[in-house]
From Swiss-Prot:
It comes from the Bacteria. It catalyses: 2 a Fe(II)-siderophore + NAD(+) + H(+) = 2 a Fe(III)-siderophore + NADH. Binds 1 FAD per subunit. Reductase activity that acts on Fe(3+)-chelates and uses both NADH and NADPH as electron donors. May play a role in iron uptake. This is Ferric reductase B. GO terms for molecular function: ferric-chelate reductase (NADH) activity. It is an enzyme of class 1 (oxidoreductase). Induction: By Fe(3+) ion deprivation. Its cofactor is FAD. Its EC number is 1.16.1.7. Homodimer. Keywords: Electron transport, FAD, Flavoprotein, NAD, NADP, Oxidoreductase, Transport.
Length: 27
């Protein structure tokens, strides 16, 4: 699941929200 999210975030890394989400998920 995390890997799928990472891929999605990578595809939408343009969005700042995605970046913030990844940070929260990593925490």
């Amino acid at each position: 699941m995390v890997k799928t999210v990472a891929v999605m975030v990578g595809s939408l890394r343009k969005d700042s929200l995605a970046h913030k989400l990844m940070k929260v998920l990593q925490k």
